[in-house]
Amino acid sequence: MLINRNIVALFALPFMASATASELSIGAGAAYNESPYRGYNENTKAIPLISYEGDSFYVRQTTLGFILSQSEKNELSLTASWMPLEFDPADNDDYAMQQLDKRDSTAMAGVAWYHHERWGTVKASAAADVLDNSNGWVGELSVFHKMQIGRLSLTPALGVLYYDENFSDYYYGISESESRRSGLASYSAQDAWVPYVSLTAKYPIGEHVVLMASAGYSELPEEITDSPMIDRNESFTFVTGVSWRF
């Protein structure tokens, strides 16, 4: 099953934007993802929703951050995270795709910087694959802004992900041996920029319960869509859930 990286990003930014010091929230949700891989239909799966903001570290979904420096306007941290992007040929309906090798999710380590202004927050981050699955790295640059409308909070975000050549080729390339087995043309993916937009809504019910919903859209570049593994040029993700705020 393919799990789009936006599932991780959709809730992580709004948590960071709204959480106060030492705030913990735990919950569960469902994630719907339109996979760009051929042979996949829409995917829906249950996911945990976890957020903690402390003085020296934080948990924002699948990212653990250790704060190196923090001020009113800036935060710099070391990060350890889980990259959920994966491809399992056993879950695919297309015979040719079933002949390809599995692409595993992986652990990432890197650095993240947040800069806060009245008009919003800028995030810049970079992280490398520490399990050597792809031997690649991923960067992100985004801006988001929380808007309060009564009890409802809305957080639109605009950003771009950067996949280096090794990362792109691991998840979207086709080797010569895979080509011979599957009949698909071999393909070497290049580094790629993936723009995305998202909107997250949060609505508290009482003192502790918070309802959440978020939608994200990614436009895939030709470095990815030219791969025979891919049959669409966009990816859509929707996540909804409920959490308990301590």
Swiss-Prot record:
Signal peptide region: 1-21
Keywords carried by this UniProt record: Cell outer membrane, Membrane, Signal
Main location class: membrane
Membrane topology of the entry: Peripheral membrane protein
The keyword Signal is assigned to this record: yes
GO terms for biological process, alphabetical: peptidoglycan biosynthetic process
Keyword Lipid biosynthesis part of the UniProt annotation: no
Compartment(s) of residence: Cell outer membrane
GO cellular component annotations of the record: cell outer membrane
One Pfam family linked to the record: MipA
UniProt family annotation: Belongs to the MipA/OmpV family.
Protein name: Putative outer membrane protein YiaT
Organism from which the protein derives: Escherichia coli O157:H7
